[in-house]
Amino acid sequence: MSMNVVCLDEGASSSRYAVNSGAVKVYPNNARLIEEDTVVSLVPNSDDVLDNLDITITKTSGESRYFPQRVLMGSLAERFSRSNTRPSMNANKCKQKLTYITVLLGTALGCLDAGIGGEEVSLIMNLPPVELTDDNVNYVKSELLGAFSVKFHKLEKEISFTVTDVVVKPEGVSASVAFFYNKDASPRVTMADYSTGYVLVVDIGASTSDLALLKDKKFIERTGQTYKLGGNTLRDKVRSKIKEVSGLEVTDEAVETLLSEGRLPYGNSYRDMSKELVAAKREFADELYDSIDSYFTTVGVGISSIKAVFVCGGGSMESSYFDEKENKEVKTSEPVSKYLLERLQEVCDSVDVVSYPDGNPRMANIIGTILIGNAYRAKKAQKKA
């Protein structure tokens, strides 16, 4: 029986998984918990598995605090009820039922993709660094180790698997692996200067930002902190700017377009609001800088002691769009890291702020987790040989 490793990154707005170093897949994490005998007459929007997430998760060996549980996720959950459960920033991730639903759904989807139903799997997952204690890791393992079945009601399919090992890594620290190494695990030449000394990792999620300090590429225990400042904070600022300038109340979709493109959908055209977006990003960077300044006081390390700040996560992306008339990409604002750099260099003009080298900063955690998973598989295979 081959060794199967499922790598997972459970975010606040969406989650990602990959099986045995395969392609990264994104899946939803909004949920509507329902009773097992609930009649769900909704017709899925398509045959895509993500439009058919009416599932029942059952732990078939050992005890569970959370299962069995039937749950709708993604588009079915949104269509069934306006009231959806989403990841909460007011409770530890390791103690939220939705975390375990999301992890096991990602595992089941991965098993479906790879055709490995009924087999043993190991999980590599992430928690906020502040939650990475022995008690929390043991709690996670007690819930996830064992045999499970996931029934997909709309697809009339059932997948089973046995989780034999769970490896828990700190969010952001996993991302740092993707900064230091290419996807083939070769060291990035451009990151050689940061291989020794202190590096701060800032992972800007939808609801929170995780900070962790590395020394010589290794996570320093007890330096993980989580701040209630994330992409949603930036969204609120952007919405306020829109109201201030135009008096308009806009949809969430319009705000997302402005964040990603720097322009606001306006009738059959667009309204340039790059100036307002830059102002909102600067305000967000100022608040993030204040958190970082407070963080360094907490961990007892000065800003001038670090070589670089690695910035990743969906909340750190630059804004641009493709102009079809001009046939070119138009950048409307820099990533948050650029504005954070300006603040940090007021204190230490030699500190570097580094964005994720491979493009989409939202992918840094899952790519780093895959690299960790590949090393895990290689080590296990070596022991068996």
Q: What are the residue ranges of the model-derived segments?
A:
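A cross-taxonomic marker for long C-terminal extensions/tails that follow the last structured domain
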Residues: 193-218
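Glycine-rich phosphate-binding loop plus the immediately following alpha-helix
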Residues: 15, 38-39, 45, 172, ...
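Short, functional N-terminal and low-complexity linear motifs
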Residues: 201-208, 254-260, 334
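Conserved acidic E/D residue at the C-terminus of a beta-strand in Rossmann-like folds
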Residues: 9, 203, 225
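Nucleotide/phosphate-binding catalytic cleft detector across ATP-hydrolyzing
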Residues: 1-199, 221, 277-282, 286-309, ...
